């Protein structure tokens, strides 16, 4: 790659994916005036298979595989991901090199009739495709009915507006980025529902030997966000977490101290194992591993073993 070669960003075509790609393009050009950046749009399996729960068709990796192949084949230089959708491991030659500043990590309660979860009537129908959200919702409100909800943000809102659901749960960050914050009736605090690993953060994946690009991306990395998200991801990697299992995790920085909370649960909310750990931010990844092992020893191992057996 020469100094004048345009940077090519591989991106899905959904409005949120395009927002993220343009966000990185703008940030690169702000940091390096005159730099040429192009978007290379593509369709992934996750965009096409909309009639089956993610957990049953390969999980979140469905949204990134085509982008990774494009980078490995030299058709694109980097890919921009919502961190909550990034699998725990990467193909050889690629890596997560930059994590941008985190947006709101909370879940959002969206409804045309009700203001919050407490207002939902007995047996209300709530839409989500996330086992993590389902698990925590069902623990709090065992009476509600969870109904599968797939598609991009606009599609999901359309299904709510068509009367298929009493409420739906979406990531607050996505709604804010798409200027749809007015659809949020209330925010669900982490104390009530822990977010997904990396929720609200945008990450950049590229070839790890592309020295010119690594240098260009340096100003986009947000250290506080990266420390928090890498702590959460270390926990998730140790649990071998994926789409098939309800795992929530959220790290906060308080000065140089990092505070990590996490949970593993049954999809129906009948059992949830929770834990937390605090320590110095420089030990964030070790703390993530420590908490994962504590969760495993406290009952999470049995939950995970059962869930993975059910999917085999």
From Swiss-Prot:
One of its GO terms (cellular component) is cytoplasm. Binds 1 dipyrromethane group covalently. Keywords: Porphyrin biosynthesis, Transferase. Signal peptide: none annotated. The keyword Cytoplasm does not apply. InterPro entries: HemC, Porphobilin_deaminase_cofac_BS, Porphobilin_deaminase_N, Porphobilinogen_deaminase_C, Porphobilinogen_deaminase_C_sf. PROSITE patterns: PORPHOBILINOGEN_DEAM. The keyword Transferase applies. The modification S-(dipyrrolylmethanemethyl)cysteine is found at residue 243. Its EC number is 2.5.1.61. PANTHER family: PORPHOBILINOGEN DEAMINASE. Tetrapolymerization of the monopyrrole PBG into the hydroxymethylbilane pre-uroporphyrinogen in several discrete steps. Monomer. Belongs to the HMBS family. This is Porphobilinogen deaminase. It comes from Vibrio parahaemolyticus serotype O3:K6 (strain RIMD 2210633). The gene is hemC.
């Amino acid at each position: 790659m020469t100094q004048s070669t345009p940077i090519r960003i591989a991106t899905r075509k959904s409005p949120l994916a395009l927002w993220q790609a343009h966000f990185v393009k703008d940030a690169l050009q702000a940091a390096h005036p005159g730099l040429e950046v192009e978007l290379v749009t593509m369709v992934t399996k996750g965009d096409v298979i909309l009639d089956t729960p993610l957990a049953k068709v390969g999980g979140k990796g469905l949204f990134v595989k085509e982008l990774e192949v494009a980078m490995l084949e030299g058709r694109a230089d980097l890919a921009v991901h919502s961190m909550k959708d990034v699998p725990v491991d990467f193909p050889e030659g690629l890596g997560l090199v930059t994590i941008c500043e985190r947006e709101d990590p909370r879940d959002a309660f969206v409804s045309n009739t009700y203001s919050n979860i407490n207002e939902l009537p007995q047996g209300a129908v709530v839409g989500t495709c996330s086992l993590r959200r389902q698990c925590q919702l069902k623990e709090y409100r065992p009476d509600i009915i969870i109904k599968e909800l797939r598609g991009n943000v606009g599609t999901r809102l359309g299904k709510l507006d068509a009367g298929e659901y009493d409420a739906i749960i979406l990531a607050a960050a996505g709604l804010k980025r798409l200027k749809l914050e007015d659809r949020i009736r209330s925010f669900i605090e982490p104390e009530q529902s822990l977010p997904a690993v990396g929720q609200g953060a945008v990450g950049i994946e590229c070839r790890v030997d592309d020295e010119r690009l690594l240098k260009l991306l340096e100003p986009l990395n947000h250290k506080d966000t990266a420390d928090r998200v890498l702590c959460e991801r270390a926990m998730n990697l140790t649990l071998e977490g994926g789409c098939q299992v309800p795992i929530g995790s959220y790290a906060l920085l308080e000065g140089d101290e990092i505070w990590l909370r996490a949970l593993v649960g049954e999809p129906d909310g009948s059992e949830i194992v929770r834990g937390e750990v605090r320590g110095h931010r420089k030990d964030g990844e070790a703390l993530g591993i420590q908490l994962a092992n504590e969760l495993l020893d406290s009952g999470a191992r049995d939950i995970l073993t059962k869930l993975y057996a059910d999917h085999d």
